[in-house]
Amino acid sequence: MTKKIILPSPAKLNLFLYITNKRVDGYHELQTLFQFLDFGDDISLEVNESGEIELLNAIEGVAKEQNLIYRAAKLLQNHTACSKGAKIGVTKRLPMGGGVGGGSSNAATVLVGLNHFWQTGLSLEQLAELGLSLGADVPIFVRGFAAFAEGVGEKLVACQPRESWYVVLKPNVSISTAAVFQDPNLPRNTPKRTLSRLLSEEWTNDCEKVVRDHYFEVEDLIAELLQYATFRLTGTGACIFAEFESEAEAKAVFAHKPHNIFGFIAKGQNRSPLHQMLNLTTFPQ
């Protein structure tokens, strides 16, 4: 492979998020549902025989060794003793700190893409275990299927929720995930429910009230758009989203977003666009 290959690095949404327990070690147990979107960043890969990992887009103020894309490539290279190299670029569309998985998705696309084109031969499950050291959400993107997660997020069950259309908006604020989970008003004892029951109920997010109470930018945007649609938080934010049956309905609401707010329209995908492109089996048999 000498030509440049462009691979999708999709966004994800947490369609619901419930916190069921805080353990003695400080970790929170949860129930959440991840789904991919047909919108995201693009990762370019150009594999070569140099043995070097070259980043074509440096992030200002971030050392190469701290860059998740570089770390993912080096991790796979070292783990498999691969002698090949690559030039890697990224076209960013997803907002930083939006809670839609940009950095984790980038790392996963690099792992999956280089494993494919370097022919290093790891299974998706092996790649997911490797990716966990890069971030808790990386295995979600590596496995490539919409998933119901329990525990501290490590127990995954393949799931096929409806593939709706979404409007996703990014309030002009950064939210500290750690601060949200440390907040004394965060619910921590939501009763556990079966997946079948959860799929039949209206979905909410236990973090949303805490975030709306502390960040007026989120509260005001949700309130301003309430006359058009009900938006809710994904993860700990800052992004919010609303669900629609058709692209036309989504476009009609998107037209009412404030001009200074970043946003996009996307369709839910139960199979990652990356895995569709590479024709990788993703749903457990």
UniProtKB/Swiss-Prot annotation:
InterPro entries: GHMP_kinase_C_dom (IPR013750), GHMP_kinase_C_sf (IPR036554), GHMP_kinase_N_dom (IPR006204), IspE (IPR004424), Ribosomal_Su5_D2-typ_SF (IPR020568), Ribsml_uS5_D2-typ_fold_subgr (IPR014721). ATP binds at residues 95-105. Gene3D superfamilies: 3.30.230.10, GHMP kinase, C-terminal domain. Coiled coil: none annotated. The active site is at residues 12, 137. It holds the Pfam family GHMP_kinases_C. It is an enzyme of class 2 (transferase). Keywords: ATP-binding, Isoprene biosynthesis, Kinase, Nucleotide-binding, Transferase. Transmembrane segments: none annotated. It comes from the Bacteria. Its EC number is 2.7.1.148. One of its GO terms (biological process) is terpenoid biosynthetic process. Pathway: Isoprenoid biosynthesis; isopentenyl diphosphate biosynthesis via DXP pathway; isopentenyl diphosphate from 1-deoxy-D-xylulose 5-phosphate: step 3/6. GO terms for molecular function: 4-(cytidine 5'-diphospho)-2-C-methyl-D-erythritol kinase activity; ATP binding. This is 4-diphosphocytidyl-2-C-methyl-D-erythritol kinase. The lineage of its organism: Bacteria, Pseudomonadati, Pseudomonadota, Gammaproteobacteria, Pasteurellales.
